[in-house]
Design a protein with these regions (language model features):
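Arg/Lys-rich, positively charged N-terminal/basic patches that mediate binding to nucleic acids
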Residues: 1-35
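A general secondary-structure junction signal
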Residues: 7, 43-45, 69
């Protein structure tokens, strides 16, 4: 799968503590080895649709991926498929605020 990283995601990863940075790097390697059906089925990533949440730049549906037990990446899917990593939230409950 092709991965696109937005600046906000990259900045959040760089500002995060070392365990989150390592987990994000591990997640990126894993994502590159998956195709879309595998992404939906992967139990560790817990890829799920965020109902009612749309990426403002593209108008695409937003999804959540588990980075660590408490950290979530917010992403959208483009044609291809390309997974766009939009943001990273170290406290996962903040990822779901509108």
């Amino acid at each position: 799968m092709k991965i696109e990283i937005r600046p906000a995601f990259d900045e959040a990863v760089m500002a995060a503590e070392v365990p989150v940075r390592k987990a994000a790097a591990k997640m990126l390697v894993l994502l590159q080895s998956l195709d879309l059906p595998d992404l939906w089925k992967h139990p560790g990533l817990n890829f799920e649709k965020l109902h009612g949440m749309i990426e403002p730049t593209t108008g695409r549906q937003l999804y959540s991926l588990r980075v660590t037990g408490s950290s979530r990446a917010i992403a959208c899917l483009l044609n291809g498929p390309t997974l766009v990593l939009v943001s990273l939230h170290v406290q996962h409950y903040k990822a779901y605020r509108r």
